[in-house]
Structures are given as structure tokens and as C-alpha cells.
């Protein structure tokens, strides 16, 4: 990365006197899909309270504990995260409990189908077929944000896909969405993510401004679902000795390249034990009727053990 951009990606905190005009909407995780979609359509993001029970969060903490010993001291993501934030990558292979949440959560499953599932007509000489391409898990990672970790420049996550935006984009036109799960209480003071409500419907070239942001504040176990078109950025943690913990599951369309190489970051022993649904999310299954992801002209998910055996020779 050109070093002239490094300083522009990590910034000082927003003045403490600034007060947002709006707060991020919170609704129970048990809310209907219609209620969740209504807020997503309007604001671009919504907090779902009590998304993960306390006992389950405790189990995730226990599973991730071995990976928290590394002292963050490198410029992760080309100076886009900062030296005082620990990043735990490949999260679903490090926490079976989190992987199970992804495998079994009906809300995430329904949102994936509505927002990111591709259904389109394929036109042949004498007929037309409807093809379906399943969404993918783009990346799974945890952030442990320490005191003094700077705020990120406001940005949109779908920039990694070279996505283009236009005013009033429909929810099923976006290229991705994220699910933040709070591993600790999240406040403005400990660096709660800055979000600009409504920015998911901006024109492509509009830049977010600090005087437009609201702050993500939620309790441990809550989740924040937001579209990849929403302008946001990590906040500045000002509290000595306090770590803000966020687990991030990012999803994308099945026609896009995943941000994290799921084929290499998930151990074979883990993948072979996963459900067909999880293998599909990672990209190991060829979408029915299409030709994406073939191995030897066939669907690798038909016999993954044999495929692994062959490539390990």
C-alpha cells in the first residue's frame, strides 16, 4: 500500500462534545423477519438484542482463549485496523460454537436467501432455465480493540468487490452484509463502530463525514446486522484497560471472490465434519445447475474426503 494513504485510514477520535442526531435501532432477536427487513431497508443496519445467550458467549470465549495471547504489534490490513487491535482470523474453524450458530441460526439463513441468493434466467437457444447460486461466507474474524486503538476512516465494506452504488438501491441488489456479534459490552467510549444511518442508499461517490455518524452501542451477545453498502468505521477506544470484542461474520454473493480464502484457512478435519449447509457457505459445493466450483467436472461436495485425498498426493 502507498504509505501516503496510511495516515488517512486511521484517525483520531471524534470530539467528545459531538452528539448524534439518531441512535441505531434495537429490536429483539426474536423479531419477525419483516420487522428486521423494515429497519434494514430504512437504515442499512439493525441491532438484534439477546442474539446469543450468555452461556453460549462464555463457551465461545473459552474456545478463542488460546488465540488471544498474541500481542497486537503489526500493521494489520495495511494500516486499516491498527497495532492496538488483535485480529483473530478464520474464526469458524477456531470456535465450533460460533460455527454452530452460523449453521443453525434461522434469521441469518433467511437473510442470506432474501439478500444474497442469486436467482436468474439463463437463456439457451430453445429454452430458458432458472439458475440459483448460493451465498458465501466471505470472512469470519474477531477484533479485540485495545485502549488507544484509533478510529477507522469511514468506508463501505463492499469496496473489496469493486461494487457500485446508486441512490435507493434495493436490499437484494447489495453484494454483501455483515453480522457483528458483541463479545463484550460495546459503547461509544470503548470504540463502538461509527455508522451513518441511511448511507446504504447514497450515490457511489459520496463520502461519509464524522458529523453524520451514530455510534453502535450494544450489550454482550447482541448482534448488529448491516449491509455492505453502509458507511461505517471502527471507533476510537478511549478507556484504559478495556478491550472491545467483536466477532464479525461477513457474507457475499456466490459469484464473488471471498475476502478470506476459506479453502485454505479451514482445516480439512473441520470441513469434513461440517454440515452440507456449512460446506456450501464456505464454497465447497457446486451450486445446482451451474458450473461454479467444479473439481474434475463435478461437484466436490459429493465426495470431499476423496477430493482431499487426491490433492494431498
UniProtKB/Swiss-Prot annotation:
Q: Does the keyword Metal-binding apply?
A: yes
Keywords carried by this UniProt record: Dioxygenase, Iron, Metal-binding, Oxidoreductase
Stored Pfam families? PhyH
KW Metal-binding (keyword) present:
yes
Pathway listed for it is: Mycotoxin biosynthesis
What are the names of the required cofactors? Fe cation
Which GO molecular function terms does the record list? dioxygenase activity; metal ion binding
Binding-site residues for Fe cation, renumbered to this chain:
155, 157, 232
Q: Which family does it belong to?
A: Belongs to the PhyH family.
Q: What does this protein do?
A: Aminotransferase; part of the gene cluster that mediates the biosynthesis of swainsonine (SW), a cytotoxic fungal alkaloid and a potential cancer therapy drug. Swainsonine production occurs via a multibranched pathway and is dispensable for fungal colonization of plants and infection of insect hosts. The first step of swainsonine biosynthesis is the production of the precursor pipecolic acid (PA) via conversion of L-lysine (Lys) to 1-piperideine-6-carboxylate (P6C) by the aminotransferase swnA, the latter being further reduced to PA by the reductase swnR.
What is this protein's record name?
A: Dioxygenase swnH2
Species name: Arthroderma benhamiae (strain ATCC MYA-4681 / CBS 112371)
Amino acid at each position: 500500500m502507498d504509505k501516503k494513504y496510511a495516515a488517512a485510514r486511521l484517525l483520531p477520535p471524534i470530539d467528545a462534545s459531538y452528539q448524534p442526531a439518531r441512535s441505531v435501532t434495537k429490536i429483539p432477536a426474536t423479531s419477525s423477519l419483516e420487522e428486521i427487513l423494515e429497519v434494514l431497508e430504512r437504515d442499512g443496519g439493525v441491532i438484534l438484542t439477546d442474539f446469543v445467550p450468555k452461556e453460549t458467549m462464555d463457551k465461545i470465549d473459552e474456545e478463542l482463549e488460546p488465540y488471544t495471547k498474541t500481542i497486537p504489534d503489526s500493521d494489520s490490513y495495511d494500516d486499516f485496523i491498527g497495532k492496538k487491535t488483535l485480529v483473530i482470523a478464520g474464526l469458524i474453524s477456531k470456535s465450533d460454537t460460533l460455527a454452530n450458530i452460523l449453521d443453525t441460526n434461522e434469521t441469518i439463513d433467511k437473510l442470506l436467501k432474501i439478500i444474497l441468493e442469486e436467482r436468474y434466467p439463463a437463456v439457451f437457444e430453445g429454452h430458458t432455465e432458472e439458475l440459483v447460486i448460493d451465498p458465501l461466507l466471505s470472512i469470519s474474524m474477531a477484533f479485540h480493540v485495545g485502549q488507544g486503538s484509533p478510529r477507522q476512516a469511514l468506508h463501505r465494506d463492499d469496496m473489496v468487490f469493486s461494487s457500485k452504488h446508486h441512490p435507493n438501491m434495493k436490499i437484494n441488489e447489495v453484494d454483501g452484509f455483515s453480522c457483528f456479534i458483541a463479545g463484550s459490552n460495546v459503547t461509544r467510549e470503548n470504540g463502538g463502530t461509527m455508522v451513518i444511518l441511511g448511507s446504504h442508499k447514497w450515490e457511489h461517490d459520496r463520502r461519509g463525514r464524522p458529523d453524520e455518524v451514530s455510534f453502535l452501542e450494544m450489550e454482550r451477545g447482541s448482534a448488529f446486522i448491516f449491509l455492505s453498502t453502509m458507511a461505517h468505521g471502527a471507533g476510537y477506544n478511549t478507556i484504559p484497560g478495556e478491550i472491545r470484542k467483536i466477532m464479525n461474520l461477513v457474507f457475499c454473493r456466490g459469484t464473488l471472490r471471498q475476502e478470506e480464502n476459506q479453502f485454505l484457512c479451514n482445516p480439512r478435519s473441520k470441513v469434513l465434519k461440517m454440515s452440507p449447509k456449512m460446506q456450501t457457505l464456505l464454497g465447497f459445493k457446486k451450486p445446482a445447475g451451474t458450473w461454479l466450483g467444479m473439481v474434475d467436472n463435478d461437484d466436490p461436495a459429493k465426495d470431499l474426503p476423496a477430493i482431499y485425498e487426491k490433492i494431498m498426493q
